[in-house]
């Protein structure tokens, strides 16, 4: 492995398995370091493509999302680092695919628990092809002021405290990612900070070893000393001992192997990582510390003394003139996310949507304050749910029953009406359910199903002003307005609409008063004197009876009733009801596998 730097200020990575927070932390680090280009060139999210919006400083940027590793590498040939956030189940396969791409030089495997046999294959392939693996079971690595992998070094506040926004003179390598964060802080307190830090990972077989990276550090001129934090278990540290004895490491090394307390236990002990377990004497922390010291490393007597040892070694380099003072720079301020600022009470922001009918922020959704569980447990029906979501109150049972009757009676009226016809033609054209439904719904208007609101408005106005049916009808005629809710293409005096009769029967038996319905019947009596088909239709029946429902329930003010009629609640009832039938017609045509509909010539009057 050896060679030198893995990263630079121009290094870009491909991020596998989209995770918003680690990527945003990488981009915030880039901004903190004054990079001109984001370090994340692209995201690989198997099965999806497009873009992900993230922040680079104060500006939002769109990072491309690719469905496959090969496509991402082809689209971003300068990205030579592959950051793998796949689970331990798929990390090996995706890592091998990345290693086989000629543009990828470094693969960081974050997952813990990758099968050891898979890891061995990855290591063998990487070494044979001169590529570097960091991990598995790693937090990653960082080159101060240049590039960092994923969550390395934690939060922005910690990065600033550790002075990672600019390069120092210390190379650091450890097995533990968590301890690496602590050591970055320690090193920043007693030296000018790190130049590069790597956590090789805690699995038994790391993709690259402590000595691999220290030999690299030895070839990087900017690194003046090395700090190593090992741990009991395994024999990785002995490869470093051999390298030092052979003179391959010429820079001062300060080392400590954690786990000296293992001797206090009578049996074998596992310390967190898969590779950190007490075994034979050679794998003990004491034996490793002694071997490192014998090879020339500075090894303190305890972990607590490690900070002092690092400081003394660094101070000596300064005295010898081998370390030049680093000019401190003030890092830019990372803009705080709006959500974080609001949560902390630092800012206030206006909302963009107001909702009063439902709330999904708790453990269960609430409709107008009524929990979903209560709706089910108390046996609420569709009418009750409509009363909550439309009227924001629980209406009496006769009201919700009337709503349900309206829905049932208006659910469908055969295949020949305009809405059903449109839906059938659309479904037979091979369109999807929503398109077929909408094509039928779009026919609802003044001439088909959409006259309920107008009927209610005109009946209410005339009744409230005590107009006689004659005055009302003739007044509408003078204005050139058809009376909404009156008239039918098929029904007549001798062939009444059964739906209207059922609604009137229910209302007379259950409503406290039916003033508006009686007025509509009086209007019908007058219009029938003009023509046999000017009967009260279902629109007029629902419109007038809904006025009686609103007025008779005692739960609405006059102003609220006027607002309900003005907004268009009643047409909503027909839209909701007829959607049931239109969906049924769509399914019916598709189930029957009906071909594309073409209207017959003989049913068209061609004229000039």
UniProtKB/Swiss-Prot annotation:
Q: Where is the active site?
A: 273
- Principal subcellular localisation of the protein: cytoplasm
Q: Where in the cell is it found?
A: Cytoplasm, Cytosol
Q: Which positions are annotated as binding CoA? A: 292-302
Which cellular component appears as one GO term in the record? cytosol
Q: Say which enzyme class the record assigns.
A: transferase
Q: Please give the biological process terms from Gene Ontology that the record holds.
A: acetyl-CoA biosynthetic process; lipid metabolic process
Q: Which UniProt keywords apply?
A: Acyltransferase, ATP-binding, Cytoplasm, Lipid biosynthesis, Lipid metabolism, Magnesium, Metal-binding, Nucleotide-binding, Transferase
Classification via Gene3D superfamilies? Citrate Synthase, domain 1, Cytochrome P450-Terp, domain 2, NAD(P)-binding Rossmann-like Domain, Succinyl-CoA synthetase domains
User: Pfam families annotated for this entry?
Assistant: Citrate_synt, Ligase_CoA
What family does the entry list? Belongs to the succinate/malate CoA ligase alpha subunit family.
Q: How is the subunit organization of this protein annotated in UniProt?
A: Heterooctamer of 4 alpha and 4 beta chains.
Q: What is the recorded function of this protein according to its Swiss-Prot or TrEMBL entry?
A: ATP citrate-lyase is the primary enzyme responsible for the synthesis of cytosolic acetyl-CoA, used for the elongation of fatty acids and biosynthesis of isoprenoids, flavonoids and malonated derivatives. May supply substrate to the cytosolic acetyl-CoA carboxylase, which generates the malonyl-CoA used for the synthesis of a multitude of compounds, including very long chain fatty acids and flavonoids. Required for normal growth and development and elongation of C18 fatty acids to C20 to C24 fatty acids in seeds.
Protein known as: ATP-citrate synthase beta chain protein 1
Q: Which organism is it from?
A: Arabidopsis thaliana
